[in-house]
Amino acid sequence: GANDAIRADQVAANEFKPEAKWAESYRQAGFGAVNAHIADGLARGSSVLLAPLGPETPAAIEAHHPEGPGAQRFILRKESGAYWSFEKGSSTQDYPSSLMGCIALLRQTLYDEQWYRGLGKQRDFTDLNLDNIGRLSGLPQFFVTNNKYDILRAERIAKEFNRSFIYKGSGEEYMYLDAVRALGRPVVLPLRFPEVPDLSDPVEARRIGLGSLVHWDQAPANAALLRKAGVPIALTSNGLDKMDAFAAAVRKAIAAGLSFDDALAALTTTPARLLGMDSVLGSIAPGHYAHLIVASDTLFKADCEIRTVWIQGQAYPVKPWPATPTMASGRYRLQGDLLA
Protein backbone atom coordinates (compact mmCIF):
# COMPACT_ATOMS: atom_id res chain seq x y z
CA GLY A 1 0.00 0.00 0.00
CA ALA A 2 0.88 3.69 -0.05
CA ASN A 3 3.46 5.03 2.37
CA ASP A 4 3.03 8.50 3.85
CA ALA A 5 6.76 9.21 3.55
CA ILE A 6 6.26 9.40 -0.23
CA ARG A 7 4.74 12.83 -0.87
CA ALA A 8 5.51 13.44 -4.52
CA ASP A 9 2.06 14.98 -4.99
CA GLN A 10 2.98 17.98 -2.83
CA VAL A 11 2.96 21.27 -4.74
CA ALA A 12 4.64 23.98 -2.68
CA ALA A 13 2.99 26.72 -4.75
CA ASN A 14 -0.44 25.54 -3.62
CA GLU A 15 0.55 25.90 0.03
CA PHE A 16 2.28 29.27 -0.25
CA LYS A 17 0.69 32.09 1.70
CA PRO A 18 2.26 35.54 1.38
CA GLU A 19 3.69 36.90 4.62
CA ALA A 20 4.98 40.46 4.76
CA LYS A 21 7.71 39.70 7.32
CA TRP A 22 8.96 36.72 5.32
CA ALA A 23 9.24 38.77 2.14
CA GLU A 24 10.85 41.72 3.91
CA SER A 25 13.52 39.54 5.54
CA TYR A 26 14.64 38.26 2.14
CA ARG A 27 14.58 41.70 0.54
CA GLN A 28 16.70 43.15 3.33
CA ALA A 29 19.24 40.39 2.72
CA GLY A 30 19.28 41.31 -0.98
CA PHE A 31 17.26 38.46 -2.47
CA GLY A 32 15.09 39.00 -5.52
CA ALA A 33 14.08 35.36 -5.94
CA VAL A 34 13.61 32.50 -3.47
CA ASN A 35 13.21 28.79 -4.25
CA ALA A 36 11.13 26.99 -1.62
CA HIS A 37 9.79 23.48 -1.11
CA ILE A 38 7.87 21.54 1.53
CA ALA A 39 10.59 19.84 3.58
CA ASP A 40 8.63 16.71 4.44
CA GLY A 41 9.17 13.16 3.27
CA LEU A 42 11.44 11.14 1.02
CA ALA A 43 9.80 12.29 -2.21
CA ARG A 44 8.76 15.88 -1.54
CA GLY A 45 7.02 17.00 -4.72
CA SER A 46 7.68 20.29 -6.45
CA SER A 47 9.27 23.53 -5.27
CA VAL A 48 8.12 27.02 -6.17
CA LEU A 49 10.23 29.99 -7.27
CA LEU A 50 9.04 33.16 -5.57
CA ALA A 51 9.72 36.88 -5.72
CA PRO A 52 9.67 38.41 -2.20
CA LEU A 53 7.47 41.32 -3.17
CA GLY A 54 6.14 43.96 -0.82
CA PRO A 55 2.53 44.98 -0.21
CA GLU A 56 2.58 47.17 -3.31
CA THR A 57 1.13 45.65 -6.46
CA PRO A 58 2.49 47.55 -9.46
CA ALA A 59 0.34 47.38 -12.57
CA ALA A 60 3.20 45.82 -14.54
CA ILE A 61 3.38 42.89 -12.10
CA GLU A 62 -0.37 42.58 -11.79
CA ALA A 63 -0.69 42.34 -15.55
CA HIS A 64 1.26 39.08 -15.51
CA HIS A 65 -1.17 37.57 -13.02
CA PRO A 66 -4.76 38.29 -14.01
CA GLU A 67 -5.91 36.02 -11.17
CA GLY A 68 -5.58 39.00 -8.87
CA PRO A 69 -3.34 40.46 -6.17
CA GLY A 70 -3.02 37.27 -4.11
CA ALA A 71 -0.20 34.74 -3.88
CA GLN A 72 0.03 34.38 -7.66
CA ARG A 73 1.89 37.64 -8.10
CA PHE A 74 4.75 36.30 -5.98
CA ILE A 75 5.25 33.24 -8.19
CA LEU A 76 7.99 33.37 -10.82
CA ARG A 77 7.64 29.66 -11.65
CA LYS A 78 4.94 27.48 -10.10
CA GLU A 79 6.99 24.28 -10.26
CA SER A 80 10.72 24.96 -10.32
CA GLY A 81 12.17 21.62 -9.21
CA ALA A 82 11.51 18.21 -7.64
CA TYR A 83 12.88 17.44 -4.18
CA TRP A 84 14.09 14.22 -2.53
CA SER A 85 15.70 13.26 0.77
CA PHE A 86 16.52 10.38 3.10
CA GLU A 87 14.26 11.81 5.82
CA LYS A 88 10.95 10.10 6.57
CA GLY A 89 9.35 13.34 7.65
CA SER A 90 6.02 13.64 9.44
CA SER A 91 4.71 10.20 8.50
CA THR A 92 3.33 8.36 11.55
CA GLN A 93 3.64 4.95 9.91
CA ASP A 94 6.12 2.53 11.47
CA TYR A 95 7.97 1.94 8.22
CA PRO A 96 10.58 3.10 7.44
CA SER A 97 12.21 3.29 10.86
CA SER A 98 15.86 3.55 9.78
CA LEU A 99 18.07 5.08 7.14
CA MET A 100 18.34 1.68 5.47
CA GLY A 101 14.55 1.49 5.36
CA CYS A 102 14.31 4.99 3.87
CA ILE A 103 16.75 4.06 1.11
CA ALA A 104 14.87 0.82 0.43
CA LEU A 105 11.50 2.61 0.23
CA LEU A 106 12.90 5.29 -2.06
CA ARG A 107 14.36 2.68 -4.42
CA GLN A 108 11.17 0.62 -4.37
CA THR A 109 9.14 3.72 -5.20
CA LEU A 110 11.35 4.53 -8.17
CA TYR A 111 11.07 0.95 -9.41
CA ASP A 112 7.29 1.19 -8.98
CA GLU A 113 7.26 4.38 -11.04
CA GLN A 114 9.14 2.66 -13.86
CA TRP A 115 6.65 -0.21 -13.83
CA TYR A 116 3.67 2.17 -13.57
CA ARG A 117 4.90 4.27 -16.47
CA GLY A 118 5.52 1.15 -18.56
CA LEU A 119 1.89 0.06 -18.26
CA GLY A 120 0.84 2.99 -20.43
CA LYS A 121 -2.77 2.76 -21.63
CA GLN A 122 -3.15 -0.69 -20.10
CA ARG A 123 -3.14 0.88 -16.64
CA ASP A 124 -6.59 0.71 -15.05
CA PHE A 125 -5.79 2.69 -11.89
CA THR A 126 -4.19 5.99 -10.87
CA ASP A 127 -1.47 6.59 -8.31
CA LEU A 128 -0.94 10.31 -7.73
CA ASN A 129 2.52 9.89 -6.24
CA LEU A 130 3.80 7.79 -9.13
CA ASP A 131 2.07 10.09 -11.61
CA ASN A 132 3.84 13.09 -10.13
CA ILE A 133 7.26 11.44 -9.96
CA GLY A 134 7.01 10.88 -13.69
CA ARG A 135 5.49 14.28 -14.39
CA LEU A 136 8.21 16.11 -12.48
CA SER A 137 11.08 14.12 -13.99
CA GLY A 138 11.78 16.89 -16.50
CA LEU A 139 12.40 19.46 -13.76
CA PRO A 140 15.71 19.99 -11.92
CA GLN A 141 16.02 17.21 -9.33
CA PHE A 142 17.27 18.33 -5.91
CA PHE A 143 18.40 15.86 -3.25
CA VAL A 144 18.66 17.18 0.32
CA THR A 145 21.52 15.64 2.31
CA ASN A 146 22.26 15.74 6.03
CA ASN A 147 25.85 14.51 6.30
CA LYS A 148 28.99 13.77 4.32
CA TYR A 149 27.82 10.27 3.38
CA ASP A 150 24.40 11.14 1.96
CA ILE A 151 25.70 12.50 -1.35
CA LEU A 152 27.46 9.21 -2.08
CA ARG A 153 24.36 7.23 -1.10
CA ALA A 154 22.10 9.38 -3.25
CA GLU A 155 24.47 9.22 -6.22
CA ARG A 156 24.21 5.43 -6.23
CA ILE A 157 20.44 5.84 -6.54
CA ALA A 158 20.94 8.40 -9.30
CA LYS A 159 23.04 5.96 -11.31
CA GLU A 160 20.64 3.08 -10.66
CA PHE A 161 17.68 5.04 -12.01
CA ASN A 162 19.46 7.21 -14.58
CA ARG A 163 18.81 10.45 -12.74
CA SER A 164 20.92 13.56 -12.24
CA PHE A 165 20.66 15.15 -8.82
CA ILE A 166 21.63 18.63 -7.69
CA TYR A 167 22.68 18.15 -4.09
CA LYS A 168 21.75 20.37 -1.20
CA GLY A 169 24.83 19.88 0.92
CA SER A 170 25.33 19.43 4.63
CA GLY A 171 28.41 21.61 5.02
CA GLU A 172 30.65 18.55 5.42
CA GLU A 173 31.52 18.06 1.74
CA TYR A 174 35.15 19.10 2.25
CA MET A 175 35.64 15.90 4.28
CA TYR A 176 35.10 13.80 1.13
CA LEU A 177 36.37 16.35 -1.35
CA ASP A 178 37.85 13.93 -3.89
CA ALA A 179 34.71 11.80 -3.92
CA VAL A 180 32.43 14.82 -4.31
CA ARG A 181 34.60 16.20 -7.11
CA ALA A 182 34.47 12.84 -8.91
CA LEU A 183 30.66 12.98 -9.00
CA GLY A 184 30.74 16.08 -11.20
CA ARG A 185 27.45 17.28 -9.74
CA PRO A 186 26.50 20.77 -8.46
CA VAL A 187 26.17 21.24 -4.71
CA VAL A 188 24.03 23.88 -2.98
CA LEU A 189 25.92 24.76 0.19
CA PRO A 190 24.49 25.95 3.51
CA LEU A 191 26.12 28.84 5.33
CA ARG A 192 25.36 27.73 8.86
CA PHE A 193 28.70 27.16 10.53
CA PRO A 194 29.47 25.57 13.92
CA GLU A 195 29.49 27.82 16.95
CA VAL A 196 32.81 28.54 18.65
CA PRO A 197 33.40 25.65 21.09
CA ASP A 198 33.08 26.65 24.74
CA LEU A 199 36.38 25.76 26.36
CA SER A 200 35.88 27.79 29.53
CA ASP A 201 35.09 24.69 31.60
CA PRO A 202 38.05 22.27 31.56
CA VAL A 203 35.80 19.29 32.29
CA GLU A 204 33.40 20.10 29.45
CA ALA A 205 36.30 20.99 27.16
CA ARG A 206 37.67 17.45 27.49
CA ARG A 207 34.40 16.14 26.05
CA ILE A 208 34.78 18.13 22.84
CA GLY A 209 36.26 15.75 20.30
CA LEU A 210 38.99 16.56 17.82
CA GLY A 211 36.53 16.05 14.97
CA SER A 212 34.28 18.79 16.33
CA LEU A 213 37.21 21.19 16.62
CA VAL A 214 38.40 20.44 13.09
CA HIS A 215 34.89 20.93 11.69
CA TRP A 216 34.53 24.26 13.50
CA ASP A 217 37.82 25.36 11.95
CA GLN A 218 37.25 24.00 8.43
CA ALA A 219 33.50 24.41 7.82
CA PRO A 220 33.71 28.06 6.63
CA ALA A 221 36.23 26.94 3.97
CA ASN A 222 33.83 24.33 2.56
CA ALA A 223 32.69 26.51 -0.35
CA ALA A 224 36.22 27.65 -1.20
CA LEU A 225 37.59 24.10 -1.18
CA LEU A 226 34.81 22.82 -3.44
CA ARG A 227 35.29 25.67 -5.92
CA LYS A 228 39.05 25.11 -6.01
CA ALA A 229 38.29 21.46 -6.75
CA GLY A 230 36.11 22.51 -9.68
CA VAL A 231 32.76 21.61 -8.10
CA PRO A 232 29.90 23.91 -9.23
CA ILE A 233 28.35 25.48 -6.13
CA ALA A 234 25.43 27.64 -5.15
CA LEU A 235 24.84 29.12 -1.70
CA THR A 236 21.65 28.93 0.32
CA SER A 237 20.34 30.77 3.36
CA ASN A 238 18.57 27.58 4.44
CA GLY A 239 19.67 26.64 7.94
CA LEU A 240 20.35 30.16 9.19
CA ASP A 241 18.37 31.15 12.26
CA LYS A 242 17.81 34.66 10.91
CA MET A 243 18.14 36.16 7.46
CA ASP A 244 20.08 39.13 8.84
CA ALA A 245 22.95 36.68 9.51
CA PHE A 246 23.27 35.92 5.80
CA ALA A 247 25.75 38.62 4.76
CA ALA A 248 28.04 37.86 7.70
CA ALA A 249 27.98 34.16 6.79
CA VAL A 250 28.98 34.94 3.19
CA ARG A 251 31.77 37.19 4.47
CA LYS A 252 32.99 34.32 6.63
CA ALA A 253 33.12 32.01 3.60
CA ILE A 254 35.01 34.69 1.66
CA ALA A 255 37.46 35.18 4.53
CA ALA A 256 38.05 31.41 4.45
CA GLY A 257 39.13 31.54 0.81
CA LEU A 258 36.05 31.83 -1.41
CA SER A 259 36.61 34.53 -4.01
CA PHE A 260 34.13 37.39 -4.30
CA ASP A 261 33.38 36.46 -7.90
CA ASP A 262 32.65 32.85 -6.95
CA ALA A 263 30.46 33.97 -4.05
CA LEU A 264 28.50 36.31 -6.31
CA ALA A 265 28.07 33.65 -9.00
CA ALA A 266 26.93 31.17 -6.35
CA LEU A 267 24.07 33.54 -5.51
CA THR A 268 23.12 34.71 -8.99
CA THR A 269 24.11 33.04 -12.25
CA THR A 270 24.64 29.51 -10.89
CA PRO A 271 21.30 29.10 -9.07
CA ALA A 272 19.50 30.66 -12.03
CA ARG A 273 21.14 28.12 -14.33
CA LEU A 274 20.44 25.17 -12.01
CA LEU A 275 16.76 26.13 -11.96
CA GLY A 276 16.64 26.62 -15.71
CA MET A 277 15.80 30.29 -15.20
CA ASP A 278 18.99 31.87 -16.51
CA SER A 279 17.11 33.39 -19.45
CA VAL A 280 15.30 35.75 -17.05
CA LEU A 281 17.25 35.67 -13.76
CA GLY A 282 20.79 35.78 -12.44
CA SER A 283 22.27 38.59 -14.52
CA ILE A 284 21.55 42.08 -15.78
CA ALA A 285 20.55 41.72 -19.42
CA PRO A 286 17.77 42.70 -21.83
CA GLY A 287 14.70 40.56 -21.28
CA HIS A 288 15.65 39.63 -17.71
CA TYR A 289 13.65 40.55 -14.65
CA ALA A 290 14.71 43.93 -13.28
CA HIS A 291 16.16 42.55 -10.03
CA LEU A 292 18.87 44.85 -8.71
CA ILE A 293 20.66 45.81 -5.53
CA VAL A 294 21.83 49.33 -4.72
CA ALA A 295 24.45 49.20 -1.97
CA SER A 296 26.85 51.58 -0.27
CA ASP A 297 29.91 49.57 -1.31
CA THR A 298 30.93 46.26 -2.86
CA LEU A 299 28.59 43.55 -1.62
CA PHE A 300 29.75 41.56 1.42
CA LYS A 301 32.36 44.09 2.49
CA ALA A 302 32.20 44.52 6.24
CA ASP A 303 30.85 48.07 6.02
CA CYS A 304 28.60 47.49 3.00
CA GLU A 305 24.94 48.35 3.53
CA ILE A 306 22.12 47.47 1.15
CA ARG A 307 20.15 50.63 0.44
CA THR A 308 17.53 49.55 -2.08
CA VAL A 309 16.42 46.28 -3.64
CA TRP A 310 14.61 46.30 -6.98
CA ILE A 311 12.32 43.35 -7.75
CA GLN A 312 10.52 43.17 -11.07
CA GLY A 313 11.20 46.85 -11.57
CA GLN A 314 9.76 47.86 -8.19
CA ALA A 315 12.08 49.66 -5.76
CA TYR A 316 12.02 48.57 -2.12
CA PRO A 317 14.00 50.84 0.24
CA VAL A 318 16.03 48.89 2.79
CA LYS A 319 18.12 51.54 4.51
CA PRO A 320 18.07 55.22 3.54
CA TRP A 321 21.21 57.00 2.45
CA PRO A 322 22.73 59.41 4.98
CA ALA A 323 21.31 62.88 4.55
CA THR A 324 23.56 65.18 2.53
CA PRO A 325 23.14 68.98 2.56
CA THR A 326 23.98 69.43 -1.14
CA MET A 327 24.19 67.38 -4.30
CA ALA A 328 27.73 67.14 -5.65
CA SER A 329 27.95 67.91 -9.35
CA GLY A 330 30.28 66.04 -11.65
CA ARG A 331 30.62 62.85 -13.68
CA TYR A 332 29.76 59.51 -12.07
CA ARG A 333 30.11 55.85 -12.97
CA LEU A 334 27.26 53.49 -12.05
CA GLN A 335 28.45 50.06 -10.94
CA GLY A 336 26.21 47.31 -9.55
CA ASP A 337 26.09 43.67 -8.53
CA LEU A 338 22.99 41.53 -8.97
CA LEU A 339 21.77 39.14 -6.29
CA ALA A 340 18.96 37.05 -7.78
PLM regions with names:
Residues 158-164, 181-188, 230-232:
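Glycine-enriched alpha-helix->loop->beta-strand junction motifs that scaffold or abut catalytic
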Residues 61, 176-179, 196-203, 319:
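Short, charged, surface-exposed secondary-structure boundary motifs
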Residues 7-9, 140, 186-295:
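His/Asp/Glu-enriched, well-ordered alpha-helical/loop segment
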